Amino acid sequence: MDLKNRISKLKILKKELQKSRSEILKALEADLGKSMEEAYLSEYLMTLEELDYTIAQVPKWARPDKKPTPYYQFPSKGEIHYRPYGRVAIAAPWNYPFLLAMVPTIGALGAGNRVVLKTSRKAPATSQVVQDILGRVYDPEEVLVYGLDPQDRARFMAEDMDFLFFTGSTRVGREMAKLAGEKMIPCVLELGGKSPVIVFGDQDLETTAKRIIWGKTLNAGQTCVAPDYCLVQKDLRDPLIQAMNQAIQDFYGPNPLESPYLASIIDQDHFRRLEDLAKAQGLDMEGKAWPQGLKFAPQVFPADPSSPFMEEEIFGPFLPVLTIDDLEDCQKVINLHPNPLALYLFSQEEKDLNYILDTIPFGGGAFNDTLTHLSTVTLPFGGVGQSGMGAYHGKYSFDTFSRKVSILKKSRKIDLDMRYPPYENFDPRKFFKK
């Protein structure tokens, strides 16, 4: 798809998104129990921001990059040209079924690719909306959407593809990496892991608590970069827990299960998994679980590294709080798990951030906030190690979904004979310093 045509189609897509806003928000409410406000802020608005940014910037991104050439190539010019891979396969998860289907699709289309998209059957209402919107803008040869049929996963994996982009669990990510290897194509894996939030040094505990609880309870904790557990100095643990419990009450009222702003757990299997963890931890669940509505009241509680909640990514509104003596202790706890997708540090000192950056590998994060790096279109988003590989968003999506073609332009006016054989009279010391 040439540049003019892809921009034109993206502008039409924007109009379709705006016309379908109510339909999108209702679908997210049906699938995940999200309030209209949360669905708007965390999925619809972020998708629109990505689309606007891509439309505005893609003409600049698509221009060849000029590069210097070494003296022994004189006279010449170097260029990097950006070309689409061809057909990009994108597998989207259920937890942000609109955002995480549309944003990589926008990036792939902006780079001139065709797309085959697989949405999640766990979010059927949103999957249908995504399919309908894209179907009104693109022909099936340009964008093909799978997701609602039980056989769609197998059909998706059997499709011809030149690039694979997957968001989801590490377990399925391994399957997708194997698929990419079998097809001999590049892939990006956006996975998950246990993302810590560290609270260190003097704090405005009220603001710190609000930002942590917001990041933890958005989408009922079903966010790949949600704070999974908290590490805090011993003398701050109890005041911080008290402040976080107050934030929960401020956000969701005295009975969070009745709040319209608390999203649901996706299905009974995930609900039972979280319920079993809570029981194993010994948490008081009376009045804090609603099986029929698939909801849990958010809970913050003291824990240690042996906690059942520390065995795997939680993906729910439960926050274990562990104590540390210093930042070296953070390393010890974090290194018990694979590299996290995100890390959050609350501190007054920039040197604390530099220490974390120098000693702990993680995908990305925020300093004195949570989640917000994910919604910043000018920053790349991606993991490291078992939390993923590759990155996207904005310009980084364009780069990810583009082949880099190197071109050296050589002048015909000057031709140095020394490059050609025979070399009997060639003395490299006359021409090269090495």
Residue map of PLM features:
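Short glycine-enriched loop/turn motifs at secondary-structure junctions
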Residues: A158, L191-G193, T223-V225, E258-S259, ...
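Residue-level signal for inorganic ion chemistry
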Residues: R6, L51, G112, V143, ...
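Residues at or immediately preceding the N-termini of alpha-helices
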Residues: L3, R21, L205, R237, ...
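N-terminal Rossmann-like NAD(P)+-binding subdomain of aldehyde/semialdehyde dehydrogenases
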Residues: M1-E79
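ALDH superfamily catalytic-core signature
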Residues: Y138, V172-P305, F367, P428-F432
